[in-house]
Amino acid sequence: MSRLLEVSDLRVEFSTEDGIVHAVDGISYGVDIGQTLCIVGESGSGKSVSSLTTLGLTRGRNASVSGSIVFDGRDLVTLPEDEMRSIRGNQIAMIFQDPLSSLHPFYKVGAQLTEAINTHQSVSRSAAKERAVELLAMVGIPDPQRRVDQYPHEFSGGMRQRVMIAMALANEPKLLIADEPTTALDVTVQAQILALLQELQDRLGMAIILITHDLGVVAEFADEISVMYAGRIVERGSDKQIFLAPQHPYTWGLLKSIPRLDTPRNEELVPISGRPPSLIQRPTGCHFHPRCPYVLDDHKRIDPPLTPVDGDPGHEAACLLSTELRTRVWKGLAAGEESAQLRHLVVEEARPLPVSGSHRLTQEADQ
């Protein structure tokens, strides 16, 4: 497969009265034609900001953007706004998490669909409406000839999200960004929407970036997964690598907090302790160390880079523990062992790390 999107060392900072918000801090990833990349993380991890920046939607908002976002051979970071408008909603489209607030309540859905069509295509009003009916049928809305003349409040939550998908696909984009598209929906409708996206991807050949806080949502949908924390990617790999052999304590926490049908009835979910850090005054060393059950003194001063797991560049993690020790800890967690017991294993077997050029040493918190 050929590369469609290449994000390199992307940094997005916002100037506020309280200081500089480091929303995205040097992330890199790529998406191939027809591929699905899932970006997972808690609220405030930077996953949505990175995608909004891809669409040029952070421009003029006290934002400083550096790095590159190369889409189809053009760097979107430096692209003039008039050229960006020809890409936004056309070659790259986005679905937002709340369809009710994304759709205008005073306009019929057909009018909103035809507006999306006419923005990038020179077609007649009748041809645009005919296309709108086709789009509603394509996303599984029954009786599209009648429903194209209805208002958003006349649709259920799941049907409104289907309308948003239809609008995003109006111009057959090469890349679809779906930002928490199932958050406001019940579990059954979530599965229907994800199945619809996968079906449309197979039919149209587009790439998808799915943004979510729930690893359970992406289990059978992702080709690759990037886990974000505090503006950085802390682990990335294939779906099998992330679910079967995760290598970062934050990923472990996300996985252990997912409800599973095969979990014993008396086994409780394990929440991730603490809260995400301030992106203005970030922790020294590993940004996850204040919440990590396996933190050692070295982790509070050394900032770990993403490094290949067992030499595999397709699976990387930003953790100072050895791959062997991380693997043993995860196997213990998967078998139901307590974090306290596994922490004892880490303390006993981890060796102090020398500071080298491959590790960033931080002496104090960001000012």
For the regions a language model picked out, list residue spans one by one:
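Conserved ABC ATPase "signature" region
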Residues: 74-75, 127-146, 255-256
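Short catalytic/signature loops enriched in Gly
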Residues: 3, 142-146, 238-353, 359
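Conserved ABC transporter NBD signature motif
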Residues: 63-75
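A short, proline-enriched helix->beta-strand linker immediately N-terminal to the Walker B motif
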Residues: 170-174
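Conserved ABC ATPase signature
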Residues: 150-155, 159
